[in-house]
Amino acid sequence: TNLNDPAYLEALQQAKSISQSRLDEALTDNQLDAIVAPSNGPGWLIDLENGDDGSSVNYVSSSGLAAIAGYPAITVPAGYIDGMPVGISFFGAAFSEPQLIALAFAYEQRTQARRAPELTSVSP
C-alpha cells in the first residue's frame, strides 16, 4: 500500500473524523469525564522456543477508537485472570490528559491491583 495514495489519505482522515465525533458525542451526550473499558484480554503465555506470533490471541482492542481519533488514553493494572495481568483503560476528549492521569492514578491508589511479577527460571 502506498501511504501517500490520495484515496488512503482520504480514508484515514475520514476514519479520524468519524472516531472523533463518536467519542465527543458519547462523552457529551452522557455527561462523562471519561470512558472506562477493559484493556485487551488477559496476557497469554509465550512459546519460549518459537516466540509469539499472536495467533493464539482472540480479542478486540478497546483502545482502537481513541487511537484512530488521536485522543488520549491511559491504561493501568486492573487485576489478574488465571495469574495473567489485565488492565483497565480510560479514554477522554482531546487534550484531557491531566484529567485522565488523575482518574487513572485514583483508580490505582484505590484498588492497589498492581503486584510485582513472579519470575520463574526457564531451562533451555
Indicate where each model-derived feature is located.
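Serine-dependent amide/ester hydrolase catalytic core
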Residues: 1-65, 118-123
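Structural helix-boundary/capping segments
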Residues: 9, 68-124
